């Protein structure tokens, strides 16, 4: 097995800073690559909230010319054996949050992450790090492949270096005006007009798609959706242009974090052995009900942990939620996001206190409790590049109810379509009614076929979405990027 030296550039890493699923991937994939004897290091902004900065090793003090804030430092620390290089420029990153405050994005985000992308390349010769592959992620580092092919095109240090871009969510395109990105003169070079998005703006994600040697989406089905107008969110021509270089690789599950046999968050651990699962999940359900002041009773419990956004399908769930609550069920939703969604959920919780609990916060502990204590997990997403919660749910014997988009279609087998290999429930139609029918289908399954449900739960728990397999797929893509 050949060894690649991978420079992983990303805006968040679980265990240091996290706002979403990108951080989970950014921790787990480098670790999986390292376990396969690859050389990997991560570049991350030195946000105020990164723990252990004061104890990190100062490895470089330098400057990036042509920037309003040119001085920056590089701090080095370790995360579970993977070196992390923190790009420390307080003017850009010493702030209370990563991207936004009070639901308002920082006005200079384009400049901030343009700087970070430029610094990710600037530090390599200065630190003597010679990667084979530079791995960019989403719009935040979309300019890394672009700068590699423009600013560093004739630099002998970068002559053999190839880049890949992982698209975790194409709806976030990193659109900023040319004025906001005037610190990157390469964007105004002749022939770069195709990077324009709308009038006088440029998309940092588009730049990455165009200039990376290989591009991947975080599931095969999402890669296929990116080649359609509906799935590409305004970038269909860009993805079609790169169709031969576009790959789909399903995210893995970090089973060291999400494993009901060893989960330190849970009030009771359990395995896929029937008696262990029955007993363990019952204890977890009781603890969840007590925590959320729901009646402690053995009724089917439907859970949901996510951001409160259109993407997560609340425009499908909210119109039918109260109708569904007429059944003898309980529903638990945990998350933060759009104020109007939260307001409606709070109102429903007020009128249905015995059946519905809404917790407007994100808690890692509570997320684990919902995964273990629920019987079903709701994911009626408008779109879902890969999705991780359906994989976590299956690991905990909690059957996912998914709209079959993106990675949800790749990872969950619907009971009605595939009874012999079912791991949950799926549907396709983008309507509240289709969601309600599927939830009712799951409810009847719980009530009428308890032994069959136990078999499906066992099968779900036995699914293996290990990062080792995903990392091997990434290595195949690295090989293609490097050697063709």
From Swiss-Prot:
Q: Give the highest taxon in the source lineage.
A: Bacteria
Positions binding ADP-alpha-D-glucose in this chain are 18
Q: Which GO terms fall under biological process for this protein?
A: glycogen biosynthetic process
Q: Name one GO cellular component term.
A: cytosol
One family name in Pfam for this protein: Glyco_transf_5
Reaction(s) catalysed by this chain's protein: [(1->4)-alpha-D-glucosyl](n) + ADP-alpha-D-glucose = [(1->4)-alpha-D-glucosyl](n+1) + ADP + H(+)
Q: Which UniProt keywords apply?
A: Glycogen biosynthesis, Glycosyltransferase, Transferase
Stored InterPro entries: Glyco_trans_1 (IPR001296), GS/SS (IPR011835), Starch_synth_cat_dom (IPR013534)
Describe which pathway this protein belongs to, using the record's wording. Glycan biosynthesis; glycogen biosynthesis
Cite the GO molecular-function annotations of the record: alpha-1,4-glucan glucosyltransferase (ADP-glucose donor) activity; alpha-1,4-glucan glucosyltransferase (UDP-glucose donor) activity
Keyword Signal recorded: no
Q: What is the E.C. number?
A: 2.4.1.21
Similarity remark: Belongs to the glycosyltransferase 1 family. Bacterial/plant glycogen synthase subfamily.
- Sorted alphabetically, which PANTHER family does this protein's record hold? ALPHA AMYLASE DOMAIN-CONTAINING PROTEIN (PTHR45825:SF11), GRANULE-BOUND STARCH SYNTHASE 1, CHLOROPLASTIC/AMYLOPLASTIC (PTHR45825)
The job of this chain, per UniProt, is described as: Synthesizes alpha-1,4-glucan chains using ADP-glucose.
Could you tell me what this protein is called?
A: Glycogen synthase
Annotated organism of origin = Vibrio cholerae serotype O1 (strain ATCC 39315 / El Tor Inaba N16961)
Q: Which gene encodes it?
A: glgA
């Amino acid at each position: 097995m050949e060894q690649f030296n991978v420079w992983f550039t990303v805006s968040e890493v679980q265990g240091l800073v996290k706002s979403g699923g990108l951080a989970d991937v950014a921790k787990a994939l480098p670790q999986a690559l390292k376990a396969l004897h690859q050389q990997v290091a991560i570049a991350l902004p030195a946000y105020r909230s990164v723990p252990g900065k004061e104890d990190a090793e100062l490895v470089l003090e330098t400057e990036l010319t042509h920037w309003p804030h040119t001085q920056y430092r590089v701090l080095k620390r370790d995360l579970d054996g993977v070196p992390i290089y923190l790009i420390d420029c307080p003017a850009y990153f010493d702030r209370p949050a990563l991207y936004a405050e009070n639901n308002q994005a920082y006005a200079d985000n384009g400049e901030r992450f343009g700087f970070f992308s430029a610094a990710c390349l600037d530090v390599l010769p200065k630190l003597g790090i010679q990667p084979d592959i530079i791995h960019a992620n989403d719009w935040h580092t979309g300019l890394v492949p672009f700068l590699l092919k423009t600013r560093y095109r004739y630099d002998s240090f970068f002559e053999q270096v190839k880049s890949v871009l992982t698209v975790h969510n194409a709806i976030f395109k990193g659109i900023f005006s040319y004025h906001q990105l005037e610190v990157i003169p390469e964007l105004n070079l002749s022939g770069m007009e195709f990077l324009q998005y709308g009038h006088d703006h440029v998309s940092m994600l588009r730049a990455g798609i165009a200039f990376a040697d290989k591009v991947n989406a975080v599931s095969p089905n999402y890669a296929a959706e990116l080649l359609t107008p509906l799935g590409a969110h305004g970038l269909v021509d860009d993805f079609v242009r790169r169709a031969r270089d576009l790959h789909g690789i399903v995210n893995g599950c970090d089973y060291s974090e999400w494993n009901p046999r060893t989960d330190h968050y849970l009030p009771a651990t359990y395995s896929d052995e029937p008696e262990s699962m029955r007993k363990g999940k019952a204890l977890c359900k009781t603890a969840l009900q007590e925590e959320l002041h729901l009646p402690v009773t053995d009724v089917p419990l439907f859970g949901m942990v996510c951001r409160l956004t259109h993407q997560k399908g609340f425009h499908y769930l909210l119109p039918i939620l109260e109708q569904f609550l007429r059944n003898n069920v309980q529903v638990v939703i945990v998350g933060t996001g759009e104020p109007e969604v939260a307001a409606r959920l709070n109102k429903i919780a007020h009128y249905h206190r015995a059946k519905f609990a809404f917790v407007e916060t994100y808690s890692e502990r509570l997320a684990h409790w919902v995964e273990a204590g629920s019987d079903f997990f709701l994911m009626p997403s408008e779109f879902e590049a890969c999705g991780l919660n359906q994989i976590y749910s299956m690991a905990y014997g909690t059957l996912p109810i998914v709209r079959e988009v993106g990675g949800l279609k790749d990872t969950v087998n619907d009971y009605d379509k595939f009874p012999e290999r079912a791991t949950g429930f799926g549907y396709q139609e983008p309507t509240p009614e289709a969601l309600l029918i599927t939830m009712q289908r799951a409810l009847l399954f719980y009530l009428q076929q308890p032994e069959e449900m136990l078999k499906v739960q066992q099968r779900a728990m036995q699914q293996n979405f290990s990062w080792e397999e995903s990392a091997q797929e990434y290595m195949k893509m690295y090989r293609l990027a490097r050697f063709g």
